[in-house]
Amino acid sequence: MKRKSERRSSWAAAPPCSRRCSSTSPGVKKIRSSTQQDPRRRDPQDDVYLDITDRLCFAILYSRPKSASNVHYFSIDNELEYENFYADFGPLNLAMVYRYCCKINKKLKSITMLRKKIVHFTGSDQRKQANAAFLVGCYMVIYLGRTPEEAYRILIFGETSYIPFRDAAYGSCNFYITLLDCFHAVKKAMQYGFLNFNSFNLDEYEHYEKAENGDLNWIIPDRFIAFCGPHSRARLESGYHQHSPETYIQYFKNHNVTTIIRLNKRMYDAKRFTDAGFDHHDLFFADGSTPTDAIVKEFLDICENAEGAIAVHCKAGLGRTGTLIACYIMKHYRMTAAETIAWVRICRPGSVIGPQQQFLVMKQTNLWLEGDYFRQKLKGQENGQHRAAFSKLLSGVDDISINGVENQDQQEPEPYSDDDEINGVTQGDRLRALKSRRQSKTNAIPLTVILQSSVQSCKTSEPNISGSAGITKRTTRSASRKSSVKSLSISRTKTVLR
C-alpha cells in the first residue's frame, strides 16, 4: 500500500454542506432555473456534495476546495492507493478500509474540529471516485449501522454514478462488481464474524500481505488463508520473492492451520509439510481456468472435514485459490457470487480472474442448495425423502440462468498435467512477478527478467518428485508431528480479524 502524508494546505473559504446534492460549492447561492427540471439532475462536471451525517460530508469536486473556519476538507486519493496488476483499480483492501475508518473517527472526535464540518472530497478521476465512495460506504455500514442499500442510495443521490470494479486479468473485461456488491459483502462479513475492526491487527495484515513476507491473507478468520505457492527453496532472484514451505510452517502452527491444499504444479515436495504435521492435498487444474465439478466437490469435502484452518495456494494464490475458497463461502454462508468475489478481493486484491467470475455465478444456485442440505443434515432433519427431493432439486438447476450466465452441462476437461505449466509463463507467473516488482524497493528490474527467473525456477524445482495427472489427493500426517526446520521470518502470532 502506498501512503503519503495527508495534504495540509491552507485553502480559502467555503462553508459547510447545506444540502444532499448540489451543483455548486456549499454556501454559494444557487441560481434557480426558470425551466421545470428535476432538481436532482446534474451536469457530469458539476461538484457534488453528499451529506453522510450532520457533520460528515462526501464530495466530488472538479476544482480545489477552499477551507474555512467551520469546514475541514481532506482527501485520501493520494494516500490510500490501489496497487493494480493491469487495468484493475479496486476495491481497496481491508487495511485501507480500516485506516480510513480510523481517520474519520479521529477527525469526528477531535476537539479542534468539534464545530467543523468534515468533508471528504475526491477529484475528477473516476477510479479514485469509486474507491473513495467505497470507503465512505464501508464506514456507513460498519460504524453508522446503515444497510448496504441505504449507504448506496446516499452515494448515488442526484444521479451520481460510479464506475464498477473489474478483475485483474490482462485485456478486456465482461464481468464487474458494483459498490452495492461490496457493501453487501462487508455487511455479511460483519454478520458472519469475518470482519471485526475491534480486534483487527493492521500491522499483521500489512506485513504478511507483502510478497517478501509470505504474500498471505486470511479470507475467513481462523478458517481460510490464501497464499502464493511455495518453491523448493527460499530466495530472492531478480526482484522475485520465492518462499520455501519452511517459511510458513511456524506461522501456520501458531494459527492452528492443519491442512494445506495445492492447486498448481509441484514446485516443492509435499513431504516438507506432512513431516511437519500437516495434511497436504493436491487438486490440480490449469492456471486461469475453472475447476471441474469433481475438484469442487473434493475441495469442499476436504475443508468440511479439516480439523483446523486451511491454507490454499496455486501459483499466485489469486485465481484458482480465490475461486475455490469462494465456492466454500457461497455454499456455507449463502452469499451471492458477486458479494463473495467482492469480499475475497477486499481481503486479497486481484483474486478470482476472467472466466472464474462467470463460473461462480453459474455455480451459485447449486452451491446454495448444497449448503441448505448440508445445514439441514447437521440439524438432524435429513431423511430419505429429503435426500431424494434434494437430489431432484439439484438435477433441475443445470439450465438455470443467473444474470444471463447459464449453468449448462459441459464436458469435463482432460485431467490436468503438471507439464502444462512447466514450459511457459502462465497467468500466475505474471501476477506474482507484478506484485513482487511493485513491492520491491527498486522497480528498475524489467518484468521480463523476473518472469524468466520464475520460469527457470519452475523447470528446476523438485526434479525428483513423481508426476501425477488429474486429481491427486495426499492426506499423510507425520506421526510425531515434528518439524526439523525453523521459520525464516515469521514471528507474529496474533490472528487477523478474530
Curated annotation (Swiss-Prot):
Residues 15-26, 485-498 have a biased composition (Low complexity). Its main location: nucleus. InterPro entries: CDC14_C (IPR044506), DSPn (IPR029260), Prot-tyrosine_phosphatase-like (IPR029021), PTP (IPR050561), Tyr_Pase_AS (IPR016130), Tyr_Pase_cat (IPR003595), Tyr_Pase_dom (IPR000387), TYR_PHOSPHATASE_DUAL_dom (IPR020422). GO terms for molecular function: protein serine/threonine phosphatase activity; protein tyrosine phosphatase activity. Residues 474-484 have a biased composition (Basic residues). Keywords: DNA damage, DNA repair, Hydrolase, Nucleus, Protein phosphatase. A motif (Nucleolar localization signal) lies at residues 1-54. It catalyses: O-phospho-L-tyrosyl-[protein] + H2O = L-tyrosyl-[protein] + phosphate; O-phospho-L-seryl-[protein] + H2O = L-seryl-[protein] + phosphate; O-phospho-L-threonyl-[protein] + H2O = L-threonyl-[protein] + phosphate. Residues 1-45, 459-498 are annotated as: Disordered. GO terms for biological process: cilium assembly; DNA repair; microtubule cytoskeleton organization; mitotic G2 DNA damage checkpoint signaling; positive regulation of cytokinesis; positive regulation of ubiquitin protein ligase activity; protein dephosphorylation; regulation of exit from mitosis. It is an enzyme of class 3 (hydrolase). Residues 213-379 are annotated as: B. Residues 199-212 are annotated as: Linker. It holds the Pfam family DSPn. Residues 214-374 form the Tyrosine-protein phosphatase domain. PANTHER family: TYROSINE SPECIFIC PROTEIN PHOSPHATASE AND DUAL SPECIFICITY PROTEIN PHOSPHATASE. Belongs to the protein-tyrosine phosphatase family. Non-receptor class CDC14 subfamily. Dual-specificity phosphatase involved in DNA damage response. Essential regulator of the G2 DNA damage checkpoint: following DNA damage, translocates to the nucleus and dephosphorylates FZR1/CDH1, a key activator of the anaphase promoting complex/cyclosome (APC/C). Dephosphorylates SIRT2 around early anaphase. Dephosphorylation of FZR1/CDH1 activates the APC/C, leading to the ubiquitination of PLK1, preventing entry into mitosis. Preferentially dephosphorylates proteins modified by proline-directed kinases. Composed of two structurally equivalent A and B domains that adopt a dual specificity protein phosphatase (DSP) fold. This is Dual specificity protein phosphatase CDC14B.
